[in-house]
């Protein structure tokens, strides 16, 4: 029997007032628990009313209570909650981080994709900084070599679209989360805008089911071996794996961290798997890394594959795809 059954509109005498159960509920919930209201209605109607029926009707009328059972007396916020990151339900997923097109390492990316294709992987997550957007950088400009020109925005976007198209020839679905480089576009626009602008720029506006761009900076893989948080965190630490270990303890799940251009794997203090998945950009093409010395660690290329629910961390030297191809 549904909550809209006729007895909800049956005239009753309750609390010395002639009313109906539906109308009585609208004020009674302010002072009574659902169990108490069910008992009062059972007595007034001469039939058994279950507390869960009262709860369902109360909720359908928008009469909310707190977790402690108190009535919610303030108007609910009309603004969205940001608690639904993109989720991939699979045991086999490829993660590419910091590709930074048009400065990608084509050979490295090709080797990684070849292995993923060999293993029958259908989904890839782009873990932030898919685009470099050098032309939108707010960093100080530099001197150019005599035969060098600065990248134009149109050329960067075109290269990103070509890379995206190539991915879709190997994978059924691409999930792209944001990184700090994509945020350069927002800083230049100086306004909040939909991720659909990136969809259009990459030429994927008619392919939104296969090439998904999320406003989140992380995604979650729901695998048979647990939850795996693929993230492009705000922080980039000098000590490899530090950010990932802290995030694993904060969110209580396995973590694959991008952004730091570091590489390695470990476990968190609570025993969760942590990986810094390296970058897919060609470090030799990054002016800030090559033209001036710094004390930051050497950039490490890499990629991550969840294969049959288990982690495989790839590296050009220490774990090359050729080991499995």
Which residues are covered by each model-predicted region?
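DNA-recognition alpha helix
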Residues: 35-46
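Short acidic low-complexity segments
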Residues: 206-224
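Major-groove recognition helix of helix-turn-helix-like DNA-binding domains
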Residues: 47-72
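Conserved beta-sheet core of the metallophosphoesterase superfamily
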Residues: 227-323
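Core catalytic region of metal-dependent phosphoesterases/phosphodiesterases
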Residues: 96, 101-209
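Short, amphipathic alpha-helical "recognition" segments used to contact nucleic acids or chromatin
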Residues: 8-32
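Beta-strand-turn-beta hairpins that frame and shape the catalytic cleft
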Residues: 84-94, 219-229, 269
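Mobile, glycine- and charge-enriched loop segments
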Residues: 75-106
